[in-house]
Amino acid sequence: MFIYCLPEESESFHKEILSIEEEIFQGLGLPYRIVDTATGDLGAPAYRKFDIEAWMPGRGDEGEYGEVTSTSNCTDYQARSLNIRYRDDDGKIKFVHMLNGTAVALSRAMVAVIENYQNEDGSITIPPALVSYTGFDKIEKKN
């Protein structure tokens, strides 16, 4: 997901992207947490970044959370290098703010779905939100 917006709108849009990403993982019924990334861990373009980490029971010795999506507010950092500008109401030329969000890091999200929905017999229950797309509700070993 990408957003180009006015500087005064970027915080609000950042929260909106995070809300969309959170809704996706709530819909999948996965345990997750939101991490507000520490400033020292941000890449150069990002002013602020949120990660959503889903619980992955198979990670480590006792399971761990792993990043499945993120959203970054890059303010005008990317706009400056790309020279993306707008003219404000007073006629002044300013740089837009740019934001991005992964939505779903598919390979990592699939790990979380498989590990959280695996049954004792090895079958995997399909999350209810995906059944209408898959056409089935369980993955089972063929006899």
Language-model features, listed with the residues they occupy:
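TRNA-recognition modules of translation machinery and tRNA-sensing kinases, especially anticodon-binding
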Residues: F2-N143
